[in-house]
Amino acid sequence: MKAFVFPGQGSQFVGMGKDLYDNNEKAKELFEKANEILGFRITDIMFEGTDEELTQTKVTQPAVFLHSVISALCLGEDFAPAMVAGHSLGELSALVAAGALGFEDGVKLVSARAIAMQKACEAAPGTMAAVIGLPDEKIEEICTEVSTDGNIVVAANYNCPGQLVISGNVDAINAACEKLKADGAKRALPLKVGGAFHSPLMQPAKEELEKAIKATTFSEPKCPVYQNVDAQPHTDPAEIQANLIAQLTSSVRWTASVQNMIKAGADDFTECGPGKALQGMIGRIDKTVSAHGII
């Protein structure tokens, strides 16, 4: 069974989507429509901007979303998944590709999400760190140990066995990284991200995004969407909306999502969007399935 998966922030690169824009009339129309909705020419930054411009949250999120969604929509009849999932931001891409959300509404929501998250990052500076080589339970335990009332760190992204991303206040992340390394982590490295995504520090962004999501019409998707907050398949529009709101302050349960998709019959995963991050994760979750980019 075919599954399509959609990457999140961090997969962006300057030049992304340019081939699509130059060689596909439908893609060009959709990119131009997005420029219009966003109120600035995001394609200029995507195709020939600087890394610094592209890594601003308010730019990165719409850029990755557009590259992913437009890649899927331009496949036409070849886009026929039995199920879909997206990693963090990629969940919005998956919902548009699966027809739960219209393209224009998706662009508006991804812009609202990015702006709300950037504001939350500026109000409560935080960061994230990738931890390699310790069991999830041990990492969770250390996060709890080093957290205090005003200085928290939580498990944010369960990416694949042996790789977990933690998120929180800068001091708490640094303290956790020291302790994790002392306790045997192969690596505990702070990431170059704008803030503490998928942690309680995103609460103001969640409240802001909730209004935008509730004001948007969602439809039943053409296939089940495995959502980050519970790693379960969803087709009910109200459930999808609630999970999308909860996602900003909840962990991304990617390992469990992929495992559950495989249990449901998925054996051929196509990553739709920039980079190969999800292909690598899927390979580490289960070596018996196929994971590739768009062929």
Predicted regions span which residues?
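A short, well-structured juxtamembrane/interface segment
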Residues: V252-N260
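Alpha/beta catalytic cores of group-transfer enzymes, especially the acyltransferase/condensing modules
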Residues: Q9-S11, L38, A98-T249
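Soluble or luminal CAZymes and related metallo-dependent hydrolases
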Residues: K26, T249-R253
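Glycine-rich phosphate/pyrophosphate-binding beta-alpha loops
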Residues: T60-P62, A196, S251
